[in-house]
Amino acid sequence: LDGYPCIFQDDYKAAVNLTEQMVKTGKKFGYITVTDKDEAVGRQRKSGVEKVLGENQITLESECVKCGNFTLESGYEKAKELFTEHPDVDTLICATDTMAVGAANWLKENGYQIPQQVQIAGMGDSFLGKIIEPKLTTVHFFYKTSGMESAKVLVDLIESKETSSVHKEIKMGCKVVLRESHRNI
C-alpha cells in the first residue's frame, strides 16, 4: 500500500534462485502453483520460475503447470494429474513446501524415485520439508528477521512525529536450501 511501511518477502527472487539450481540437473519441468489472484505466491513465484526456464531455453508447457490451493492434498492431486499426463517430467517445483510434500507423497506411492527420477523442490522451508524422506529442497525466507524489522518500523512510527522519516519498504532476502530431493545432494 502506498504511503504505508511494508516489510515483505521477495517471492520473485526466491523462485529465480531456486529455479537456477534446479535447471542445472533438470530437463523437463512441471510446476504446481496457486491462483494468480495471489500476487506473491501465485504470480511472483511463477514469473521467477518462467524467467529462469526461458533464459535456459527450457519450455514450461502450459499443460505442465497445475494450479492448487496450498494444501498437502492439493499437491498430491496436482502431482497425480501432472504425472499421469506427463510421466516424462523430471523436475517438479512447487509454490509452497506443503504442496511439494503432498506431491512427493504421490510420487513415492507411485514408485517414482526422488531425486533419481524426479527432483522436487518447494518454497518456505517448512518443518514438514525437513522431516520427510528425502528431505525437501526449498527456499528459506527470513521470517524471524521480518518480524524484528516490522517491530523496529513500528517503534519508529510510534516515536517519530514525521512518518516520512520511517523507511517505507523493506524487501527481505532469502536463501536456497539444497537437500536430498535435489539431484546434486
Where in the sequence are the language-model features?
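Flexible loop/turn connectors
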Residues: G3, D10, A14, T25, ...
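Surface-exposed cleft-lining segments at the edges of enzyme active sites
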Residues: Y4-C6, I32
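Alpha-helix N-cap and loop-to-helix initiation/capping positions
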Residues: C6-D10, V41-Q44
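Alpha-helical elements of Rossmann-like donor-binding domains used by nucleotide-donor carbohydrate transfer enzymes
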Residues: N17, Q21, Q44-K51, S74-E81, ...
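An alpha-beta-alpha
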Residues: L18-I58, E63, V166-R183
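Small/polar loops that bind or transfer phosphate-bearing groups
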Residues: T33, V41, C67, A95, ...
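Alpha-helix N-cap/loop-to-helix initiation residues
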Residues: D38-E39, T71-L72, A100
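Short beta->alpha junction loops
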Residues: C64-E73
